[in-house]
Amino acid sequence: MSREQAFEMLIKILCKTDSTDDMKLILECILTRSEMEDLIDRIRIYNELLNTNNSQREVASKLGVSITKITRGAANLQDNNIKDFLRKKISY
């Protein structure tokens, strides 16, 4: 199986998952604790960037993450399609 095929399979598995318990189980099976923490930090970063007027440095300090991670998240939000999608999915 190619990486592309595996990626498509992963997307299908995640899309077919309809309970939070099942999703948690899948994520715990395929991600290391460190990878899970990185994903959680990204969600926290997007939430702060989308829902506050804090500077990137303030967000980094508040969340206890590197300014590099904040800058990467802010760069992703420059794409209006991504920003609109995340705004609909992420809220307080």
From Swiss-Prot:
It holds the Pfam family Trp_repressor. Residues 56-78 bind DNA. It comes from the Bacteria. One of its GO terms (molecular function) is sequence-specific DNA binding. One of its GO terms (biological process) is negative regulation of DNA-templated transcription. InterPro entries: Trp_repress (IPR000831), Trp_repress_bac (IPR013335), Trp_repressor/repl_initiator (IPR010921), TrpR-like_sf (IPR038116). One of its GO terms (cellular component) is cytoplasm. Transmembrane segments: none annotated. This protein is an aporepressor. When complexed with L-tryptophan it binds the operator region of the trp operon and prevents the initiation of transcription. PANTHER family: TRP OPERON REPRESSOR (PTHR38025:SF1). Belongs to the TrpR family. This is Trp operon repressor homolog. It comes from Xylella fastidiosa (strain 9a5c). The lineage of its organism: Bacteria, Pseudomonadati, Pseudomonadota, Gammaproteobacteria, Lysobacterales. The gene is trpR.
